[in-house]
Amino acid sequence: MKKITILALIMSLFASAFAIASEVNIFNARHYKADGELYAKFTNKTGIKVNLINGKSGALEKRIIEEGADSSADLYITADAGRCGAMDAKGTLQGGLTSAAIKSAVPASFRTSKWVGIAKRARIIYYSPERVTGAELSGMTYEGLADPKWKGRLVIRKSSNIYNKSLVASLIKNNGKAATAAWAE
C-alpha cells in the first residue's frame, strides 16, 4: 500500500505541472494492476486523462532517447533504479523532483532530483528442499553465496541483467569495490 501512496503523491505533484494539459503520457514498463487503478484515481481527481504507453523497458528507453526533446513521454515508470540511473547517465531525464513532499515521503537513498523510487523489491533466494536444507540457509546472505560449498549449485540471471547489476551496485555500496570484486570471482 505504501508503494501506491508514494506513486499517488508523485502523480499529484505532477498534477500542477500538467494543469495546462488535458492529458499526460506515461511510458510504462511495469505491469501491476494497482498502477492502473492509481492512474484512474488520478484522472478522476484531476480531470487529466492518462495515456499509457506500455512496453518493455529497453524499447521504451530507446524510443525516449531517439525522440529526444520531441519525446511524447511526460513520465517514465520502470521497474529498477538501475534503469533510472542509466537513463540519467545518458542525460535523458529532467530535474525538478525536489519538493518537500517527495523529500518527506521518499528516503534520500531512493531518489535524486531526476527520479524517485516508488517501490522496493526483495531479492529472495529460492531453493530446492530436496537438495538444500533450511539449516544450510540459516543466516544466508548474498555475500554467503560466494562460499565454495555453493559452487555448481546456483542458477542466476545473466550478469548483464539490470537486476543483477543493481544487486552488485548495492554490494559495492555496502561492502566496497574490492570485497565485491572478490565476491564476484
Label every model-predicted segment:
Residues 10, 65, 134:
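Generic anion/oxyanion-binding catalytic loop in active/binding sites
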Residues 17-21:
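Boundary at the C-terminal end of the N-terminal hydrophobic targeting segment
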Residues 29, 33, 72-185:
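Extracytoplasmic ligand-binding site segments that recognize negatively charged/polar headgroups
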